[in-house]
Amino acid sequence: MSLGPLMLDIAGTELTETDRVRLSHPLVGGVILFARNYASPAQLAGLTAEIHALRYPSLLIAVDQEGGRVQRFRDGFARLPPMRVLGEICDRNPDRAHHLASQAGYVLAAELKACGVDLSFTPVLDLDYGQSCVIGDRAFHREPQVVADLACALMNGLQSAGMAAVGKHFPGHGAIRADTHVETAIDTRSYTDIEKEDLIPFRRMIDAGLSGIMAAHVIYPAIDQHSAGFSSRWLQRILRHDLGFEGCIFSDDLGMQAARNYGSITRRAEQALQAGCDMVLVCNDADAADELLGSLHWEFSAASLARVECMRGQHMIHSMAQLHEMERFLQAADEISKIDPAGISVSL
């Protein structure tokens, strides 16, 4: 059985029989984990092993493990700083900030890989305009070139541990106050304004080999009436054609309020896939997931399947015990632990 275009979640720290049946459906291609699915590194490793064993090829396992307030796995994992802290260090010592970003990416990826998680939806490429409460300190910086530099460094760290990077939220979520989890979000700027600011990190990352992008549930009416994740203009014309992106496109969660304007969960999935998403996420709504599995008819193209498969990366580290014997990891984790929330590194 090949993979499908849906990424779903599960209820708890162990698979239930309902989870197993749901994840065995041919439309499913991935699982996203949350804090409720985590108790310890050993438990997580057992859970991911069971998920991977359900199917061949195995389901893709993802998580939002960015650092700061968006870090699903905490106890037993290195505490990662908010990305804004790296931006603040960059204002004083760019070389040090780039080094720490790479180290943070390595630690993040190495720990997840050691527990069987394939990828994290990171880095955040949104600019810190000081407008968005939902983005806030998740963003590296206000200046697009600084964001691009730090994100490229973090991606290098991820890749050195065998993990692909996913840039989000295309084409930029930082300039609006609205939280797409709970309301419709509209960015009234022109394409020219977005291109000369928000698209710079995406363009730089694409040129550097970015593997995945997550689209924003934000409407940019000067460009298209549909939000980016439902817009073929954004995903196919601008992202694929103009920016030359050849990697995997993920939707943001189709259960968010900003996505509900597009009809039933099945209609939302259809429109996102038709617009150009390779894989769509449905989170925190088991009834919607079951409805979708019973009603969606979608032929997963060979091209989309290949792009999803490329998100697996490599499993070079097989356990936390092995990881904690590696000098490179110990050094990187030590450096990251010495960064405090005020953006001060003891090595500065």
From Swiss-Prot:
Q: Catalysed reaction(s)?
A: Hydrolysis of terminal non-reducing N-acetyl-D-hexosamine residues in N-acetyl-beta-D-hexosaminides
Q: What Gene Ontology terms describe where this protein resides (cellular component)? A: cytoplasm
Q: Which domain of life is it from?
A: Bacteria
UniProt pathway annotation:
Cell wall biogenesis; peptidoglycan recycling
Which cysteines in this chain are paired by disulphide bridges? none
Name the PROSITE patterns on file: GLYCOSYL_HYDROL_F3
Instruction: Cite the position(s) of the site with description Important for catalytic activity.
Output: 179
GO terms classed as biological process: carbohydrate metabolic process; cell division; cell wall organization; peptidoglycan biosynthetic process; peptidoglycan turnover; regulation of cell shape
UniProt binding sites for substrate = 64, 72, 138, 168-169
InterPro entries from the UniProt entry? Beta_hexosaminidase_bac, Glyco_hydro_3_AS, Glyco_hydro_3_N, Glyco_hydro_3_N_sf, Glycoside_hydrolase_SF, NagZ_Beta-hexosaminidase
Sorted keywords for this record are: Cell cycle, Cell division, Cell shape, Cell wall biogenesis/degradation, Cytoplasm, Glycosidase, Hydrolase, Peptidoglycan synthesis
Which EC number(s) does UniProt give? 3.2.1.52
Where in or outside the cell? Cytoplasm
The answer to whether the entry has keyword Cytoplasm is yes
Protein's UniProt keywords contain rRNA-binding:
no
Cite a single GO MF annotation. beta-N-acetylhexosaminidase activity
The record's active-site residues are: 181, 252
- Which protein family is named in the record? Belongs to the glycosyl hydrolase 3 family. NagZ subfamily.
Record's function text: Plays a role in peptidoglycan recycling by cleaving the terminal beta-1,4-linked N-acetylglucosamine (GlcNAc) from peptide-linked peptidoglycan fragments, giving rise to free GlcNAc, anhydro-N-acetylmuramic acid and anhydro-N-acetylmuramic acid-linked peptides.
Quote the protein name from its UniProt record. Beta-hexosaminidase
Could you tell me which species this protein originates from? Answer: Nitrosomonas europaea (strain ATCC 19718 / CIP 103999 / KCTC 2705 / NBRC 14298)
Coding gene? nagZ
